[in-house]
Amino acid sequence: RKIAGICRSIKPKYEYTVEVYSIVVPSGVRDIMREGDALSHCVGKSDRYWERIEQQEAYILFLRKTAEIDKPYYTLEVEPNGTIRQKRTYFDRQNDDLKDAEQFLKEWQKVVSERLTESDREKAEKSKVLRLQEFEQLRQDDIRIHTGDLAGQRLVDVLVSDLMETAA
């Protein structure tokens, strides 16, 4: 219930559509779990995402092709200021097609930055501090990815390379 309320409250701020791509805010937990199942990645299976949404540290949003708005494409983990922590498609991958969407994502970040309130900016500052603390802990613990295409890589290195900070 709390997550559904948060999703409703952020929808006007984060949803965005142009001819080719759209950012879609899920309605709640069921949409997020369906997305994780459809793309066979971890977003619907880990409590940490629910906790981050409830604390408004980060949100789960969907990158979609506008012509196929209901078809899962990429799942995004996004901080309150539009900083994108993760961009993942099937099996936690990033395919070459993501490069085509990068300009759209940068444009979306600019649009979001114009919609932010002071409260959003404060949440974003806290979110960044928590992210940096998590990265440091992952480095210290030398956490490795165990499955999939990224098996053997340090998780922190993958997360850092995935990060798309907003210019705002």
Give, region by region, the residue ranges found by the protein language model.
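Catalytic-core elements of nucleic-acid end-processing and repair enzymes
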Residues: R1-A168
